[in-house]
């Protein structure tokens, strides 16, 4: 099999390695961890052998635990946000005029580190079931420093 374009061939990890439901994360079963078996010729950020997280609805299953997704469907790569994305703790968010303040959980940006306090404009973010949020680094105006 030769995977083409921006497609990722993947396999679900075992159930005991999947996100767990908690009091704050009641929709954990919507997200799945998968091992990347192969990638298409237009996939640059994800590599064979990586562990990725994505919504189960974005997996095109070809059997019970293997399938395909697009590189755009990936939320986390090896427990880090995709390139130029920042994972924030939405529960500590505070509004300051038109900007919001939040604490960074994880970042793939060179300028923003885990634990930084950032100020950003709300918009095209991706809210996860555990009430954390993935946003583009272009939404961030500044960090406390």
Question: What are the functions of these language-model segments?
Answer:
Residues 1-145:
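Acidic-enriched and Gly/Ser
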């Amino acid at each position: 099999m030769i995977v083409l374009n921006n497609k990722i061939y993947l396999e679900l990890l075992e159930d005991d390695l999947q996100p767990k439901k908690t009091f704050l994360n009641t929709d954990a079963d919507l997200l799945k961890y998968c091992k990347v078996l192969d990638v298409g010729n237009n996939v640059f950020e994800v590599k064979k052998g990586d562990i990725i997280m994505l919504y189960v609805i974005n997996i095109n299953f070809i059997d019970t635990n293997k399938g395909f997704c697009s590189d755009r469907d990936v939320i986390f790569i090896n427990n880090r946000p995709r390139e130029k994305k920042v994972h924030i703790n939405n529960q500590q968010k505070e509004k300051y005029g038109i900007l919001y303040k939040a604490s960074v959980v994880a970042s793939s940006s060179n300028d923003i580190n885990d634990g930084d306090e950032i100020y950003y404009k709300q918009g095209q973010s991706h809210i996860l079931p555990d009430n954390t949020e993935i946003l583009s680094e272009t939404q961030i105006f500044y960090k406390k420093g």
